[in-house]
Each structure stands twice: as structure tokens, then as C-alpha cells.
């Protein structure tokens, strides 16, 4: 049971870290297709989506 709590605490601490590589660029958008060419210019890959009116790119 102690091992379970130890693993649980470690999981909670690791989940609080921001391990994602996502990049918010300062480009307004209405839909994800608008972000693809802007992400290609910004980070070199056309992988992204529109979230809350801003483009979010994934390297």
C-alpha cells in the first residue's frame, strides 16, 4: 500500500510539469486550416490547430 502512495505522489509531481513542446504563435484564427501555413513559417512544420482564437503549433 505504501508503494501505491509513493507511485501516486510521483505521478502527481510529474503531471504538474509542462512536458509538451507546443508553441503558441501570435496569429489570430477562426479555424485550424488557417494555422497550418503560419505554423509552417514559424517552426517549419505544418502541424497545428486553432485554440481560443490563437494558433498553437506542434514541432
From Swiss-Prot:
Residues 48-55 are annotated as: Interaction with Ca(2+)-activated K(+) channels. It is found in: Secreted. Keywords: Disulfide bond, Ion channel impairing toxin, Neurotoxin, Potassium channel impairing toxin, Secreted, Signal, Toxin, Voltage-gated potassium channel impairing toxin. Its main location: secreted. One of its GO terms (cellular component) is extracellular region. InterPro entries: Scorpion_toxin-like_sf, Scorpion_toxinS_K_inh. Disulfide bonds join 29-50, 35-55, 39-57. The record marks 58 as: Aromatic residue of the functional dyad. Expressed by the venom gland. Pfam families: Toxin_2. One of its GO terms (molecular function) is toxin activity. Residues 1-22 form the signal peptide. The record marks 49 as: Basic residue of the functional dyad. Belongs to the short scorpion toxin superfamily. Potassium channel inhibitor family. Alpha-KTx 04 subfamily. Has the structural arrangement of an alpha-helix connected to antiparallel beta-sheets by disulfide bonds (CS-alpha/beta). Inhibits with low potency Kv1.1/KCNA1, Kv1.2/KCNA2, Kv1.3/KCNA3 and Kv11.1/KCNH2/ERG1 voltage-gated potassium channels. This is Potassium channel toxin alpha-KTx 4.5. It comes from Tityus costatus (Brazilian scorpion).
